[in-house]
Amino acid sequence: MTQTAHPDTVLIVDFGSQVTQLIARRVREAGVYCEIVPFQSAEEGFKRLKPKAVILSGSPASTLDIGSPRAPSVIFESGLPVFGICYGQQTMCAQLGGKVESGHHREFGRAFLEVEKDCALFDGLWSLGSRHQVWMSHGDRVTALPEGFEVVATSSNAPFAFIADETRKYYAVQFHPEVVHTPDGAKLISNFVHKIAGIKGDWTMSAYRAKAVEAIRKQVGGKKVICALSGGVDSSVAALLIHEAVGDQLTCILVDHGLMRKDEAANVVAMFQEHYNLHLLHIDASDRFIGELEGVSDPETKRKIIGRLFIEVFEEEAKKLGGADFLAQGTLYPDVIESVSFTGGPSVTIKSHHNVGGLPERMNMQLVEPLRELFKDEVRVLGRELGLPESFIGRHPFPGPGLAIRCPGGISREKLEILREADAIYLDEIRKAGLYDAIWQAFAVLLPVQTVGVMGDGRTYEFVCALRAVTSVDGMTADFYHYDMEFLGRAATRIINEVRGINRVVYDVTSKPPGTIEWE
């Protein structure tokens, strides 16, 4: 889908911070559209977007290094409000005539600000002399301010923790307002976009729905579209949005790759047939997928195989239907944001996204991606707009490669069936305990490890099942869910008693970072 024009946009210049997406989330939550652009192409992004304000992100880089990232001069020449965060503060000061030095005391974690001076950004939030918690993560620090700036708040280790040039509407902070550990951070960002930049909060999913439908109609015309319906929230919302735009030109195809949760394919088909007048084909391709995946242990190879087979199946089905010109996907904004390396080299790839990494370079259909401007929480709101049942919208995220990446090591039909049963029991216990909505994501993992056990009068040598549950706001950071031991004992007992092939259950207490939510 061609991106629609947004007259009131905030440009976020990304210098390589791990939490730049959180800045965008906070701006969107304030009802304002924004885009993240890497610093290398920020000048082009500035000219293309014609923003009403600019935010400069943090970075692992140091402004003291030769060739370190800089904001394009056009930003400071534009007269627009600018908000610098952490590294963004440092490069703003360095570029405008201030001074940055390597800090004698690196500051990481919780800190407290003392408000030294009234500031327009504090309106309705902070008052003179008040004290507020923030989250620091920096080594370098500003030691001399550019002309026109003054200190408005300090911390014990950061005398220039919050600075402002109110005449030019430049604001800069040494801490991270975008993270949840800065309780008033979201409000500070909201004040910047609304009260400083004067942008209306009219970025809503209702407005997005209308613009997206118009854009889909313009892109597709009278041609046919096949939608890759996985059964997840993203692809389901994409399907309903496209159906609203082009009606019977859309055919949804649900490929059962044999990697879904228990009864998932049947439940998805039933829901769409009962509630929506969609043309839906259910393709059982499990033999084909599992045949190629059997024995494959490398997680990246698994993803590539699954991505390739998905496209092959869709192209084959399109030919059976008489040809389709467009393939629809539920790709989200975090999937398409260009990763940034502040050194100028390639960024480290943690894992390929199944919508991106698995696609072949040559494809016989054009992509329609109506959700590519949205974050996950926005997709859920849009789903409600489109009438998806709350029970469906609130489902835990499920990866495109499915159970293949919850079965580390080589996979087989037997292992998948064992995992599927264990996962179903675990989720059933979570629902019975009334915990499902309190948990961001929960699932079982079948480890490639067998251990000795005793059942009845004999010894067993069976697999270990790991249970995972996390709490999160956005999936970018997560903490393990703190179950009581009675619940864990109950879930483990049911799994061991009811699933042949498992004789030991463990619970994963790793947060993200350092771990990821999924095991592969």
UniProtKB/Swiss-Prot annotation:
Give me the reactions it catalyses.
XMP + L-glutamine + ATP + H2O = GMP + L-glutamate + AMP + diphosphate + 2 H(+)
Q: List residues of the GMPS ATP-PPase domain.
A: 203-395
GO terms of molecular function:
ATP binding; GMP synthase activity
Residues annotated as catalytic: 86 (nucleophile), 176, 178
Q: Write out the function statement from the record.
A: Catalyzes the synthesis of GMP from XMP.
Q: In which pathway does it act?
A: Purine metabolism; GMP biosynthesis; GMP from XMP (L-Gln route): step 1/1
GO cellular component term, pick one: cytosol
UniProt cross-references to Pfam families, sorted A to Z: GATase, GMP_synt_C, NAD_synthase
Name of the protein in question = GMP synthase [glutamine-hydrolyzing]
What Gene3D superfamilies does its record include?
A: 3.30.300.10, 3.40.50.880, HUPs
Asked if the Swiss-Prot or TrEMBL record annotates the protein with the keyword Iron, the reply is: no
Q: Where are the transmembrane segments?
A: none
Q: Where does ATP bind?
A: 230-236
Give the first-level EC class, as a single word.
Answer: ligase
Task: Give the organism the record lists.
Answer: Sinorhizobium fredii (strain NBRC 101917 / NGR234)
Q: Which domain of life is it from?
A: Bacteria
Origin organism lineage? Bacteria, Pseudomonadati, Pseudomonadota, Alphaproteobacteria, Hyphomicrobiales
- This enzyme's EC code(s): 6.3.5.2
Q: Where in this chain does the record put each Glutamine amidotransferase type-1 domain?
A: 9-202
UniProt keyword annotations, A-Z: ATP-binding, Glutamine amidotransferase, GMP biosynthesis, Ligase, Nucleotide-binding, Purine biosynthesis
Q: Which HAMAP family match?
A: GMP_synthase (MF_00344)
This protein's assembly is summarised as: Homodimer.
The reply on keyword Ubl conjugation is no
